[in-house]
Amino acid sequence: MTIKNEIKHLKRKIDKNFFQKDYTSISDIKDYQVKISKNPRPRLNLLITSMNSQDVYAGIKSAVDFFVKFKKFDIDLRIIVMGKRIDESSLYPVPDFTFIKDYPIENDNDSKIICDSSKNCSSLFIRERDYFLSTMWFTAYNADSILNKQEKLFGKRMPMVYLIQDYEPGFYPWSSEYLLAESTYHLENQLVVFNSRYLKDYFDKNGYVFEKSFYFDPVLNENLRNVLNLNGNSNIERKNRILFYGRPSKARNAFQLICMALEKWSLLDENSSQWEIYSAGEDLKDVKLKNNLVIKSLGKMSVENYAKFMLESKIGISLMVSPHPSYPPLEMATFGMKVLTNSFVTKDISDFNENIKSIEHININRLAEELHRLTTAQTDYKVLKNDNYVNGVSQIDTIVDNIGLYLKFQKCEV
C-alpha cells in the first residue's frame, strides 16, 4: 500500500469513527412545534436566514426592505429567523420591531416582533390568518410544512408569498439540496415575486407556473445615488484601472475564470503593464499574474469608497453564473465604466445601457479578447443615468398593493 493510499484509508477510518455524518437530516430543514394562537388578527411573517447586522446586506437586506413595505396594512408583522441564531448584541435594527427572546403565548399579541426559530423543534405559535413571506429556498420548504399544520389546525391553508432572488438549486451540485430547492417552485398557491425581469424570464422559459407572479426592476442603492448626483457630472479623470467583482467563495461569480482571462489578456496587450487591476468584494491576498501584474484586493469597500473608485476607473468585470443580473455590473455601467459580464440562457443585460457588453458562451479567450478590445480602444467614458434605476422608481409598491389586495389586507387608516 502506498503512502497516499494509507493516508486515504486513515482518513476514512477517522471520519467513520469520529465524524459520522447524520444522513437523516439537513440542518436548514426544521420540524417546528406548531401551537395554536387564537389571535384573530391577520399577520404576515417574514422567514429569513439571519438578522445579525453583519449578514443584512444584498438579498437579506432586499427581503427586509420588501417586508417592511407591508406596514401600510392593518396587520401584525413578525420576523422569524430560521438560519443563524440571533446575536442580540448585533441584531439588525428594524424600526418599531421588538426582539422576543422567550416567546410565551402572551407575546403573540404583539404587533411587530422578531423571534429566533433557528433551533430545530422550536415552538411556533400559528394563527388562523398567518401568512408567510419566504425568502431562501429552505424557508419556503419550512413554510410549506407549517402551512400543512395550519390547515390541520384551522381547516384552511393560507397562500404563501415567495420572494425569489436567484435560481437557488444552482447553488448546489446535483444533490439532495438541489432537488429540495427546486421542489419549492412547485408548492401550491404561491404568490411569487422576482427581483428582476431577467430572472422571471428564466422561470417562464423553464415552464414554472405560479398562482400569481410579479417582478420588480433593481434600483440604485440610495447612498450610491447620492454620490452619483453630487459627483456624476464633474470632470473626474479616469485612470487605467480595471475593477472586478471578486468573490472566490461564491462559485457563481467565476473568480478563477476572471483571473485566468486577466493573465491571458496581460500577454495579449503589450501595454498591460500600464494598467492597475483591483478586486472588490472579499478580503483576499494579492494575486500575481505574468508580466509582473498583480491583482490587488480591496475587500469589502464602504459605499463612498466604492462609488469614488468607480468614478475614477475605466473598466469593470462582473460575472454571474445564474439568471440573476447581480448589481455590480449595473452600478459600474451607471458610473461610466465600460463593463464586461456574461449572458446566461435568457439573461442579456447589455440592454441596460451602452456601457455593458454581455458575452455569450463566455470562456477565458473571449473574456481576454473583449478586455483587450477595451484596453486598446479610444473610448469616451460617460456616466449614464437610467432614470428609473437611478431615481429609485420600481414596481415594488404596486406589487405590495396587489399582494395585499389578494390576501384581503385592509389599509391602515391615516
Q: Which stretches of residues belong to each language-model region?
A:
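Acidic anion/phosphate-binding donor-loop and adjacent secondary structure
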Residues: S25-Q33, P169-S175, F214-R238
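A charged, aromatic-enriched C-terminal amphipathic alpha-helix characteristic of glycosyltransferases
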Residues: I362, T376-E413
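Conserved catalytic-core segment of nucleotide-activated headgroup transferases in glycan assembly
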Residues: G59-S62, H186, K205, L220-S297, ...
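Acidic donor-binding loop of glycosyltransferase active sites
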Residues: D130, L311-H324
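Short hydrophobic beta-strand element within catalytic cores of glycosyltransferases
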Residues: K338-N342
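Donor nucleotide-sugar binding/catalytic pocket of nucleotide-sugar-dependent glycosyltransferases
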Residues: E188-V227
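Membrane-proximal helix-turn-helix segments that form the acceptor-binding/catalytic region
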Residues: I126-E128, S175-V193
